[in-house]
């Protein structure tokens, strides 16, 4: 089954569409690998918590040796530095499009390994047992700069 077909199969009403749309939005960007995709989704999620005080989609990030990973993303795309190729960008709300564009602008020049290593030294990852807690992410990144 192709990545596009699997994502289409996952579509559900409400917030799950935002999960799929966010994954598709980043995956449609030129030069995006699965590792970078996971990292960008992580940063979009945490900055969404900070800027909008809500979850932008039902991501669940696990502590793995690679960094914070939503297992659904790694199931679809694997964990590699192979470039992902996907079709057109999905249509998003203006608020979500603005956030994802900001994340892309800030982090797209870095490779996925660098972004994951960076996340691994931050409190929410270093203190997690298994699942990174949204509360820990919000508290840490509320005090961190986007730099």
Predicted regions and their residues:
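Domain-edge interaction signal
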Residues: 1-147
